[in-house]
A protein has these predicted regions:
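Alpha-helical, coiled-coil/dimerization segments enriched in small aliphatic residues
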Residues: 248-282
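Short helix-initiation/N-cap motifs at beta->coil->alpha
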Residues: 83-85, 143-151, 278-286
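Ligand-binding pocket segment of bilobal, Venus flytrap-like solute-binding proteins
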Residues: 73, 274-308
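Extracytoplasmic substrate-binding proteins
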Residues: 171-245, 342-364
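A short, structured surface patch at a secondary-structure boundary
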Residues: 69-71, 96, 100-153
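Proline-aspartate-enriched helix->loop->beta-strand connector
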Residues: 151-163, 181, 291, 295-299
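Structured C-terminal subdomain patch of bacterial secreted/periplasmic proteins
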Residues: 295-364
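Bacterial Sec-exported substrate-binding components of ABC uptake systems
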Residues: 2-16, 20-103, 208-237, 308-311, ...
Length: 364
């Protein structure tokens, strides 16, 4: 059971930890008899596991740029459906890329093109680039936010390629295309693999993108088979300052669980929206709400913001939460929100697969 001591530690660490519900702990490492080669992926803190402590963000981006597809100095790339024009002429070797969506930044990192990014829109509500992509991405200058990019700032960077998102800034395409060749991919989320292919095509690295995705698919299948994933149901939960979000199957993390073969509880098999929300204010929790929609064999919990991380102590120590069977069995894991929710690309997906190695960990 997640105990009050752990939850107080969460609250104390929230101010310093921006993307997870907890920081480091002093508990013993958890190990699994079925995964003897696994090196302390989980630190046990009063019964709750914090995943990703062994992750190395500086190893996230490919060290070298992927090889370009053979062909002329300029190529044709397709925009996402609904964007005019359908086809854009782009340089085969762009050197000054401006990227406006997190999944595209992740894709460029996976392709080893991070050094060519001269600016990137910042995540909404953040003053810095995503930490999970490491120091290769952290110093990249911001140009507004993903929902409100700074057009003047973009123009000042003199880009030779702009990558944008139909799902984030659909009305800005004409203005962006007036600055430099611009390719829009689809809304970030469940379609992340197609968006990676779109970034690959826009940077003349379609073959490299396909190879990366084939490698991911093989590894996801291998992890699923090794850890008997299909016989376990996993829950995806995100805490905000006043809500508990329970995710369905039409979103980024659910697509990764699907690739691994992890089952989902019946209450989370909806597809008409990314998630449902349950009130989690003090007043809501005092009414003893039914949180069974969040329950499963294992629950993966992330926090949407530092304020949500600070609030997590109250939510996870509430009577309604304590009733969940996964909580009783010490099968609640705290995960990185950048990796599970906002990354929405191959590097983030690899991180989720790493966390899913605990899906069949023994009940403690």
């Amino acid at each position: 059971m997640i105990r009050t001591a752990f939850l107080r530690a969460v609250a104390a660490l929230a101010a310093a930890v921006a993307v997870t519900c907890s920081g480091c702990g002093s508990g013993k490492p958890a190990t699994s008899a079925t995964t003897p080669a696994l090196v302390t992926p989980t630190t046990q803190i009063a019964g709750a596991g914090v995943l990703g402590n062994d992750r190395r963000p500086d190893d996230s981006c490919a060290r070298d740029a992927a090889a370009a597809d053979p062909g002329p100095k300029t190529r044709q790339a397709h925009n996402a459906a609904g964007v005019t024009p359908d086809v854009v002429e782009v340089p085969a070797e762009p050197q000054r890329i401006v990227v406006l969506s997190g999944d595209q930044l992740d894709a460029l990192c996976a392709l080893g093109l991070q050094s060519r990014v001269v600016a990137a829109a910042l995540p909404d509500g953040s003053a810095s680039q995503p930490a999970y992509l490491g120091n290769a991405v952290h110093p990249i200058p911001g140009v507004g936010t993903r929902s409100n990019p700074d057009l003047a700032g973009i123009a000042a960077k003199h880009p030779d390629l702009i990558l944008g998102s139909q799902g984030l800034t659909p009305k800005l395409y004409p203005q962006l295309a007036g600055i430099a060749p611009t390719v829009f991919t689809a809304a970030p989320g469940a379609a992340w693999q197609e968006n990676l292919r779109g970034v690959g095509a826009a940077t003349s690295r379609g073959a490299a993108a396909d190879a990366l995705l084939n490698g991911f698919s093989q590894r996801a299948s291998d992890i699923g088979a090794r850890h008997d994933a299909s016989h376990f149901q996993a829950s995806i939960v995100q805490l905000t300052t006043d809500k508990i979000r329970v995710y369905g199957t039409n979103n980024f993390p659910a697509s990764v669980l699907g690739a691994v073969g992890v089952d989902r509880p019946a209450a989370q098999r909806f597809t008409d929206k990314p998630y449902i929300e349950i009130g989690a204010t003090d007043g809501d929790l005092a009414k003893n709400p039914d949180l069974s929609a969040a329950d499963a064999d294992v629950i993966y919990v992330s926090c949407a913001s530092p304020a949500a991380a600070q609030r997590a102590a109250t939510v996870l120590d509430s009577n309604p939460w304590r009733k969940l069977s996964a909580n009783h069995d010490n099968r609640v894991y705290v995960v990185n929100d950048e990796v599970w929710q906002t990354g929405e690309g191959l590097v983030a997906a690899r991180g989720i697969v790493d966390d899913l190695r605990l899906v069949n960990a023994p009940i403690n």
